[in-house]
Amino acid sequence: MAFTCSDIFKIIIAIILPPLGVFLERGCASSFWINIVLTILGYIPGIIHALYVILKY
């Protein structure tokens, strides 16, 4: 799977602020809200979920 420039940008944003990376990829879907909860509970789970969402879609 080839990465585009926007994918790399979203990955960098996801490391800094995970919910924003998910929002840029999926919009205001359930993945966004799940990521907000995971980021509040722990920063690392939020990053892992954000990277999963970005790399999957």
Curated annotation (Swiss-Prot):
Keywords carried by this UniProt record: Cell membrane, Membrane, Transmembrane, Transmembrane helix
Entry keyword annotation includes Ribosomal protein: no
A family per Pfam: Pmp3
GO cellular component, one term: plasma membrane
Membrane topology: Multi-pass membrane protein
Family: Belongs to the UPF0057 (PMP3) family.
Protein's UniProt name: Plasma membrane proteolipid 3
Gene name of this polypeptide: PMP3
